[in-house]
């Protein structure tokens, strides 16, 4: 039932007609209105500018991974990045007909140390830079000892030095001397965290330049072991992203630390396989990103190293050239034994399904795992005129005279890289399962078109080594290379 309401008419007062305003009041009113509009515009611009500034500060501090959708890409990097391949060529190893020559690792390291102004972060496996560390009296240790001396001089001149190192079982003298000089050192117990080691090898200088490659902090890595790496100069975008990987190690080096189930957002990255960084590299457009292993050490946005490696293999259409010390489709350190065919399957598929030319240059020395030979023979057996599969395998043997042969754990090709017609992959891991699932490692991936870039330089290094007298087919007589190789 609708209630009965009493309505009363609302009386609106009748306004008296307004008279015309004088001209001076009209002009004053217009001026005030114009001023108010300008004030409003300035306020709007101030609010927008403040919002943009706060957003930029937020991204700088916390990363902007979650602000980008799946089809959106981060802004390109405008740094004039310069990449230089660097190598350690063991004493006595010569390439007389080579047309390519790269700076030495020791030259690159000393140059980075001389140019450091504010900070140096080093991720490392172990430290043996002096003869005392290896109980030797080798003149060739001088380069490593000079590197250590220059490192000791950094903190006293105001450079902040941080070193993340795998919890050591070996010599500590170098690290103790660096601590005394003012460096900070944290030991990462990867055995406790993932049942592996910290196998990474990189430097970041002033968050602007960096080295990444196969060389350990070992005098032998400068003069008695064949190494390859890359130095990036004036590339702060990539250097800051590599620093995020270092910060993860630094975090895990704290007492009682554990791997977070979800990494805090400051460790996240926006650069990965799906959204690589757009850079100008040696004057040429390129796409680049950094990958990391094992997966638990990959915060938001970081591509795992194995996924990155397999993407290079899967996207190759012409050739895949690989140079690594160890190649095993197994969990190398697993008990009981476990087969691990992830990379092996990718290479076979590339050769058989797409007709990609595959070349593997594997190291052979006195410490090679004998079971590698069977797996390498299996790969090489795919080369067949009927299937048109083209896989070839060679063993690289670094020769040694009597004195060199006495140097422990030396005279080996320690490279860890891959190059295709499109992409450069430079890593720090050997190619067996445990290195990608348990051990900490890092890789740099660069895609670049044209000739003369980093990719073509690395291809030239591979072909130089492949065609050299130090590379041997699997059916080579063991007598022809002496007893330095366990796989012949």
Curated annotation (Swiss-Prot):
Disulfide feature: 77-237, 81-235, 364-485
Top-level taxonomy: Eukaryota, Metazoa, Chordata, Craniata, Vertebrata
Annotated protein name in UniProt: 5'-3' exonuclease PLD3
Location in the cell: Endoplasmic reticulum membrane; Lysosome lumen; Early endosome membrane; Late endosome membrane
Free-text domain note: The catalytic domain contains two conserved PLD phosphodiesterase HxK(x4)D(E) motifs that accomodate the phosphate group of the nucleic acid substrates, with one nucleophile histidine residue forming a phosphohistidine intermediate and the other histidine protonating the leaving 5'-OH ssDNA/RNA fragment, resulting in the cleavage of the phosphodiester bond. The homodimer has two independent catalytic domains arranged at the dimer interface.
Top EC group: hydrolase
UniProt catalytic activity: Exonucleolytic cleavage in the 5'- to 3'-direction to yield nucleoside 3'-phosphates; a 5'-end 5'-dephospho-ribonucleotidyl-ribonucleotide-RNA + H2O = a ribonucleoside 3'-phosphate + a 5'-end dephospho-ribonucleoside-RNA + H(+); a ribonucleoside 3'-phosphate-2'-3'-cyclophospho-GMP + H2O = a ribonucleoside 3'-phosphate + 2',3'-cyclophospho-GMP + H(+); a 5'-end 5'-dephospho-2'-deoxyribonucleotidyl-2'-deoxyribonucleotide in single-stranded DNA + H2O = a 5'-end dephospho-2'-deoxyribonucleoside in single-stranded DNA + a 2'-deoxyribonucleoside 3'-phosphate + H(+)
Main location: endoplasmic reticulum
Superkingdom: Eukaryota
Topological relation to the membrane, as annotated: Single-pass type II membrane protein
Protein purpose: 5'->3' exonuclease that hydrolyzes the phosphodiester bond of single-stranded DNA (ssDNA) and RNA molecules to form nucleoside 3'-monophosphates and 5'-end 5'-hydroxy deoxyribonucleotide/ribonucleotide fragments. Partially redundant with PLD4, can cleave all four nucleotides displaying higher efficiency for ssDNA and RNA fragments initiated with uridine and guanosine residues and lower efficiency for cytidine-initiated substrates.
Chain ranges on the Cytoplasmic side, renumbered to this chain: 1-38
Taxonomic source organism: Rattus norvegicus (Rat)
Family that this chain belongs to: Belongs to the phospholipase D family.
Positions of phosphate binding: 199, 201, 216, 414
Transmembrane region(s): 39-59
Post-translational modification (record): N-glycosylated. Proteolytically processed to a soluble form that is stable within endosomes and lysosomes. During transport through the secretory pathway becomes proteolysed by cysteine proteases, thereby releasing a stable soluble lysosomal lumenal polypeptide, whereas the transmembrane-bound fragment is rapidly degraded. Its transport route to lysosomes involves ubiquitination and the ESCRT complex.
GO biological process: immune system process; inflammatory response; lipid metabolic process; myotube differentiation; regulation of cytokine production involved in inflammatory response
Gene Ontology MF: a single term: metal ion binding
């Amino acid at each position: 039932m609708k209630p009965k309401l009493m309505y009363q008419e609302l009386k609106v007062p009748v306004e008296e007609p307004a008279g015309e305003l004088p001209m001076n009041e009209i002009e004053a009113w217009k001026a005030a209105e114009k001023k108010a509009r300008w004030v409003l515009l300035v306020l709007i611009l101030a609010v927008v500018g403040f919002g943009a500034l706060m957003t930029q500060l937020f991204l700088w501090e916390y990363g902007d991974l979650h602000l980008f959708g799946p089809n959106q890409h981060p802004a390109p990097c405008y740094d004039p990045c310069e990449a230089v391949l660097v190598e350690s060529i063991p004493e006595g190893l010569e390439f007389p007909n080579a047309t390519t020559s790269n700076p030495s690792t020791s030259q690159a390291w000393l140059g980075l140390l001389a140019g450091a102004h504010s900070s140096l972060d080093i991720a490392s496996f172990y430290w043996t830079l002096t003869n005392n560390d290896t109980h030797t009296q080798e003149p060739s240790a001088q380069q490593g000892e000079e590197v250590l001396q220059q490192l000791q001089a950094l903190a006293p001149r105001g450079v902040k030095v941080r070193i993340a190192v795998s919890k050591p079982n070996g010599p500590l003298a170098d690290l103790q001397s660096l601590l005394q000089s003012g460096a900070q050192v944290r030991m990462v117990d990867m055995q406790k965290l993932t049942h592996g080691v910290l196998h990474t090898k990189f430097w970041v200088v002033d968050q602007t330049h960096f080295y990444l490659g196969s060389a350990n902090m070992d005098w032998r890595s400068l003069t008695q072991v064949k190494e390859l790496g890359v130095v990036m100069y004036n590339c702060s975008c990539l250097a800051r992203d590599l620093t995020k990987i270092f910060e993860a190690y630094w975090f895990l080096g704290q007492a009682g630390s554990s791997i977070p189930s979800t990494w805090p957002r400051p460790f996240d990255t926006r650069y990965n396989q799906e959204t690589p960084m757009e850079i100008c590299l040696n004057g040429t457009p390129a796409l680049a990103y950094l990958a990391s292993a094992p997966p638990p050490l990959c915060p938001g946005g970081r591509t795992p190293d194995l996924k990155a490696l397999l993407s290079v293999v899967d996207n190759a259409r012409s050739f895949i050239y690989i140079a690594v010390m160890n190649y095993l489709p197994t969990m190398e350190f697993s008990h009981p034994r476990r087969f691990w065919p992830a990379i092996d399957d990718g290479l076979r598929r590339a050769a058989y399904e797409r007709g990609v030319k595959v070349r593997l240059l594997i190291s052979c020395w006195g410490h090679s795992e004998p079971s590698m030979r069977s797996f390498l023979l299996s790969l090489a057996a795919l080369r067949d005129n009927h299937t048109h599969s083209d896989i070839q395998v060679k063993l690289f043997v670094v020769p040694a005279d009597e004195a060199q042969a006495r140097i422990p754990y030396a005279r080996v090709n320690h490279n860890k890289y891959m190059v295709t017609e499109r992409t450069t992959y430079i890593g720090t891991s050997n190619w067996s399962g445990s290195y990608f699932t348990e051990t900490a490692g890092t890789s740099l991936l660069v895609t670049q078109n044209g000739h003369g870039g980093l990719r073509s330089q690395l291809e030239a290094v591979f072909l130089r080594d492949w065609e050299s007298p130090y590379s041997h087919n699997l059916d080579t007589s063991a007598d022809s290379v002496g007893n330095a190789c366990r796989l012949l």
